[in-house]
């Protein structure tokens, strides 16, 4: 593990810095110099018709301003006084019997970058104090995230709109601490991807490889997964968000291992996500057709990475990836026509139907992307990130090519579009399934910093897959 990451993470999560960033964004959006930010953590929730608790996932905006993973907590930030207060649950004697002593206010003050820690019983009194201290104080909260017992009546004005926007826009640019968390999530997840490739030689089912990935992540400190992982053997890789992860890796017809394994998985480290995709041959060596498609996707990714720096339009990077795909598929004879004609007609969408990437942070599809799902151009409809890349933003770069009959058949059946695809040549590639390569990179002023260390050079992949 990177020792420089350990050094950064030895300090406190910079909640106070984040609170100032959000307050500054509120001011930039025209909402004055004073006021109180109010946020609640996620509540403890029970499984329906059961006495067990649902899996807990902290509200991201609350964590951003507190660094606190506890449920049933609150925070206030007095913008004018620059004072951040965390409110945590008091001791419940019945709970102590089962769960042990909770975190005390003094312990919380040592752990978190806040100015004061009080009991949740003190929230309303503290809110009333802010109002009495200065007439006309305004409170900023998020609609539908305020408990019924909380009262804002003493405040002259309550704003339920701007805080969510301000927090989500502030979260786009990551500080050094956040980048360290993302780097650690990538370090661990990359180790897990390597473990999966090595384990595949003896594995007989997709679920065995999922188990290997999760176990490796947990052993290094990622107790949660960033999202439901994808372990897609053979043609299952043609389904973008394949979910079953329980199919045999041996083809029942031939009795041999399926061609490829697509793994899209990332561990979550202290609420920050990795999102990595790799493809490897289950036999230890790519088939000729698989290698041809892999090489095109790798070129799509490498040329995209070369374009990345602050100020670049993401749509331009995405468009370039489509052009690389078109040139590659033309060379193989799968497509017919000119590059420009195929680009204008959107034929590459039949094989590359999703966006090139998205922002990454506490959420896998992180805030600030501004997608336009109403876009009439099929190449951009599912692009989750639009506009200029921000310096300090973290993006995924995940081009792919898929041989999915459900997507491609309508193109083949179209009198207008079918002429651009050679069905006879295409026939050789259905068994490839899908190839996607995904790295997580920090956008810098003059380029990028790739956080992902999992191997992707095909010769390295084959060596790992073939085993000793």
Curated annotation (Swiss-Prot):
Recorded catalytic activity of this chain's protein: Release of any N-terminal amino acid, including proline, that is linked to proline, even from a dipeptide or tripeptide
Domain of life: Eukaryota
Enzyme class: hydrolase
Coiled coil: none
Binding sites annotated in the UniProt record for Mn(2+) 1: 275, 398, 438
InterPro entries attached to this UniProt entry: Aminopep_P_N, Creatin/AminoP/Spt16_N, Creatinase/aminopeptidase-like, Pept_M24, X-Pro_dipept-like
GO molecular function, one term: manganese ion binding
Pfam families: AMP_N, Peptidase_M24
Entry cofactors: Mn(2+)
Binding site for Mn(2+) 2: 264, 275, 438
Free-text comment on the cofactor: Binds 2 manganese ions per subunit.
EC code(s) of this entry: 3.4.11.9
Function: Catalyzes the removal of a penultimate prolyl residue from the N-termini of peptides.
Name the record gives this protein: Probable Xaa-Pro aminopeptidase PEPP
């Amino acid at each position: 593990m990177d020792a420089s990451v350990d050094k950064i993470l030895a300090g406190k999560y910079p909640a106070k810095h984040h609170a100032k960033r959000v307050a500054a964004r509120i001011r930039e959006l025209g909402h004055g110099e004073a006021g109180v930010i109010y946020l609640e953590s996620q509540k403890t929730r029970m499984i329906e018709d059961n006495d067990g608790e649902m899996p807990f996932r902290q509200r991201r905006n609350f964590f951003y301003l507190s660094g606190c993973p506890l449920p049933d907590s609150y925070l206030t930030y007095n913008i004018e006084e620059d004072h951040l207060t965390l409110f945590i649950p008091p001791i419940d004697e019945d709970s102590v019997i089962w769960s042990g002593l909770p975190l005390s206010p003094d312990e919380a003050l040592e752990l978190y970058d806040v100015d004061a820690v009080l009991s949740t019983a003190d929230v309303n009194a503290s809110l009333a104090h802010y109002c009495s201290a200065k007439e006309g104080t305004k409170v900023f909260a998020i609609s539908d995230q305020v408990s019924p017992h909380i009262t804002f009546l003493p405040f002259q004005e309550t704003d339920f709109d701007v805080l969510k926007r301000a927090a989500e826009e502030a979260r786009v640019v990551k500080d050094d601490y956040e980048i360290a968390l993302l780097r650690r999530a990538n370090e661990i997840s990359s180790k897990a991807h390597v473990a999966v490739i090595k384990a595949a030689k003896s594995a007989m089912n997709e679920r065995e490889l999922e188990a290997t990935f999760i176990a490796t992540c947990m052993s290094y400190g990622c107790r949660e997964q960033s999202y439901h992982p994808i372990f897609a053997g053979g043609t299952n890789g043609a389904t973008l968000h394949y979910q079953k992860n329980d199919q045999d890796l041996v083809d029942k017809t031939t009795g041999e291992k399926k061609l490829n394994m697509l793994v899209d998985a990332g561990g979550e480290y202290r609420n920050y996500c990795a999102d990595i995709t790799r493809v490897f041959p289950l036999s230890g060596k790519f088939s000729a057709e698989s290698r041809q498609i892999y090489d095109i996707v790798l070129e799509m990714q490498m040329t995209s990475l070369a374009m990345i720096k602050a100020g670049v339009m993401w749509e331009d990077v995405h468009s370039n990836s489509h052009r690389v795909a078109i040139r590659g598929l033309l060379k193989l004879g799968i497509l017919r026509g000119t590059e420009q004609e195929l680009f204008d007609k959107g034929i590459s969408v039949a094989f590359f139907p999703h966006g090139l990437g998205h922002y990454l942070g506490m959420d896998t599809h992180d805030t600030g992307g501004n997608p336009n799902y109403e876009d009439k151009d099929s190449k951009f409809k599912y692009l989750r990130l639009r506009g200029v890349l921000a310096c300090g933003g973290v993006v995924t770069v995940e081009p792919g090519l898929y041989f999915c009959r459900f997507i491609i058949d309508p193109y083949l059946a179209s009198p207008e579009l079918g002429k651009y695809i050679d069905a006879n040549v295409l026939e050789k590639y259905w068994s490839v399934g899908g190839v996607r390569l995904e790295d997580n990179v920090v956008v810098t002023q003059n380029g990028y910093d790739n956080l992902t260390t999992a191997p992707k050079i095909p010769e390295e992949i084959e060596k790992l897959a073939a085993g000793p």
